[in-house]
Amino acid sequence: MFHFFRKPPESKKPSVPETEADGFVLLGDTTDEQRMTARGKTSDIEANQPLETNKENSSSVTVSDPEMENKAGQTLENSSLMAELLSDVPFTLAPHVLAVQGTITDLPDHLLSYDGSENLSRFWYDFTLENSVLCDS
């Protein structure tokens, strides 16, 4: 009620959203702008963290095997790639899907390398009913 007596706020000219050639209007930052802001944030975080040197009782796990280092690097690379791919998605994944994504690195290699298409005979299905419906119409 009291806002009737106040001076109306000065209206700023709203920025015109970019329109693509196909007629869609882009809202928010583009992927390039998001990457630039993400890089800026990570460099700010890295710059603000104090350096830790020569701590004897550290609780961090050290990886000495080069193969394990390679797998750890690939896992980190895959998770950053997945995060980058999902950054443009306008919704979030369900919590149980996110939990599965987090535990996939804990699975043994023989389970991860299993190819489900090797044993397709167990997925056999008879389409005679569907074919008869299509042929009758």
From Swiss-Prot:
Residue ranges with Polar residues bias: 50-63
Protein name: UBAP1-MVB12-associated (UMA)-domain containing protein 1
Composition bias type Basic and acidic residues, residue spans: 32-44
Domain UMA: 86-134
Region (Disordered): 1-72
Native source species: Homo sapiens
InterPro entries linked: UBAP1-MVB12_assoc_domain (IPR053292), UMA (IPR023340)
